[in-house]
Amino acid sequence: MKALFASTARGLEELLKTELENLGAQECQVVQGGVHFQGDAALVYQSLMWSRLASRILLPLGECAVYSDLDLYLGVQAIDWTSIFAPDATFAVHFSGLNDTIRNSQYGAMKVKDAIVDAFTRKNLPRPSVDRELPDLRINVWLNKDTASIAIDLSGEGLHQRGYRDRTGQAPIKENLAAAIVMRSGWQPGTPLLDPMCGSGTLLIEAAMIATDRAPGLHRTHWGFNGWAQHDESLWKEVKTEAQVRARRGLSEYASRFYGSDNDARVIERARTNARRAGLADIITFAAQDVTNLTNPLPEGPTGTVISNPPYGERLESEPALIALHSLLGRIMKNQFGGWNLSLFSASPELLSCLQLRADRQFKAKNGPLDCVQKNYRLAPTQPGAAPAQIAEDYANRLRKNLKKLEKWAKQEGIECYRLYDADLPDYNVAVDRYADWVVIQEYAPPKTIEPEKARQRLFDVIAATLSVLGLAPNKLVLKTRERQKGKNQYEKLAQKGEFMEVHEFNARLLVNLTDYLDTGLFLDHRIARRMLGQMSKGKDFLNLFSYTGSASVHAGLGGARSTTTVDMSRTYLEWAERNLRLNGLSGRAHRLIQADCLSWLAESDEQFDLIFIDPPTFSNSKRMEETFDVQRDHLRLMKDLKRLLRRDGTIMFSNNKRGFKMDHEGLAALGLKAQDITQKTLSQDFARNRQIHNCWLVTHQTKD
């Protein structure tokens, strides 16, 4: 009997133990990442040929204490390597683990290699050669703290490499993990199996191999025992011949079918090629088809199992499409696959919740570094006339109500960009803005009292409901997370796409960028204020401070302003403003753009203007102020500088987003100015639910009696 070790992915150890016991293994002991077991020479070959779950089969040779590199060298050399492989065989060393002495795995591998080579040369035998790519024998050394475990890797390459798949491209799951997913899915061989997002077909091919009694090692051409001195070629041939006979018989007797589809025709062709290599092309049907068009291949029965490893995203921008995909999949399952089983493997439990299905069983496993879950669902038979379950029903109803009210209004007003929803319901703390045929969802950062998982689930529900209510394609939805802005956060880039789209606001054409920044280039709540500026600007010199992308300057120019002066500290936004002006035929000396700190420029300028628009930040750092700028604290100083630039009959439109802002009327009067609160006049229908979104004032010189 030989002591052996089978490694596997985390979470599959118990499943592997059962598999090895069924092959005849004895004294199986589960440890993290694998199973220790005992077996004779026949079992060694049986486990290599038939284990669908093991990553590698190792034959331990011994252990040694490692307190220095010399300890490692001597411990390895103590093994009788000349009885393990011949000097004309090639070998390679795989070393993993570090300690205080061996701090580099390459150095550890070199010391092991030196010890093995020296074991031959000290007996006056030829020096064996190293072949890192395809050695005759692979030595595995694992250093755990101060103990090195030395073993022969009888697998050679990982056992997940069955020989049917092209290894050039990245695959989302390895074959042994795919086999485990199939085993845990509840699918029974002899019943239909469908994968609607099959990729290169791994899940279906592994299932077909199980169903037709085809050994996973049957198509492998290279093994780690080729150079092992104790290798029994005749015994190995017996194991291989038996596997070939069983595979032929299993395929000829199998009556059911497997179905796979994917939206990428090139991937489907690769899946067909893989199935041909595996000898299973005759029982697997592949089709290039999007999940949107998925139908039950056997509507009259029999029932079977749907299995898949659907895509998941690590980037926020990919989530809307994935949420839509999972929501759609859930609806299709309920509508077309009643009575079937469904099993999905995912790194995102939140996405699986978008199915709106209750799982009967679930399993955990590691897919490389990712913590994953497999959930099995029993799909109830479809009831005629049953109403589909709604996601985030309260939110969906409110959005539907707002849409009915605002869509007609926006069309009459001649605007394409407006707010559909603004945290109307406390459980759904988002803003939803429409930009022509696009939608931007901004998630306000949830309070710390809300569990992150619950907040994330609500966001997923909002996205799914928004897509459903608006009938929106997932690629037309942009998701952002908004927090209270401090300092320069509002200028920080989120992405680098550089994609601009043109929208219409009354008679103005404006460019917005929905992805690259937290804001889009157009403050929707100032829409009425911009129209008022256009109506007030005819024949006037117009100044736009803290101009952002210059949309107010565009409206003033279109309203007939004699000149526009647009000032902002950001070169990016000034270039954007210039594009906006040119888009509307506004260019030349009459339309100046100035890059400057607005407060410093204001303090130094001696120009005169008839109409000034200023929308300063609530708080910022500024060279002009000794420390900071606070709009509540410093608005009188701001007005003092603005007064100097304002002509006798001129008007300042002053706006800010400070909640609870109080205008210092007495201080203004002392400056010879007066202010009229026009906030309510500047709030359009889409912001009627949030009357504190901004405050807006008209400031003029006091008239003398």
From Swiss-Prot:
Gene Ontology cellular component terms for the protein in this record: cytoplasm
Purpose: Specifically methylates the guanine in position 2445 (m2G2445) and the guanine in position 2069 (m7G2069) of 23S rRNA.
Entry keyword annotation includes NAD: no
Keywords for the protein's UniProt record, in alphabetical order: Cytoplasm, Methyltransferase, RNA-binding, rRNA processing, S-adenosyl-L-methionine, Transferase
Taxonomic superkingdom: Bacteria
Subcellular localization: Cytoplasm
THUMP domain sequence ranges: 43-154
EC number of the protein: 2.1.1.173, 2.1.1.264
Entries under InterPro entries matching the protein: 23SrRNA_methyltr_KL, DNA_methylase_N6_adenine_CS, RlmKL-like_Mtase, RlmKL-like_Mtase_CS, RlmL_1st, SAM-dep_methyl-trfase, SAM-dependent_MTases_sf, THUMP_dom
Protein name: Ribosomal RNA large subunit methyltransferase K/L
Organism: Cronobacter sakazakii (strain ATCC BAA-894)
Pfam families registered for this protein in UniProt: Methyltrans_SAM (PF10672), RlmL_1st (PF22020), THUMP (PF02926), UPF0020 (PF01170)
Family classification: Belongs to the methyltransferase superfamily. RlmKL family.
GO molecular-function terms, A-Z: 23S rRNA (guanine(2445)-N(2))-methyltransferase activity; RNA binding; rRNA (guanine-N7-)-methyltransferase activity
Catalytic reaction annotation: guanosine(2445) in 23S rRNA + S-adenosyl-L-methionine = N(2)-methylguanosine(2445) in 23S rRNA + S-adenosyl-L-homocysteine + H(+); guanosine(2069) in 23S rRNA + S-adenosyl-L-methionine = N(2)-methylguanosine(2069) in 23S rRNA + S-adenosyl-L-homocysteine + H(+)
SMART domains reported for this sequence: THUMP
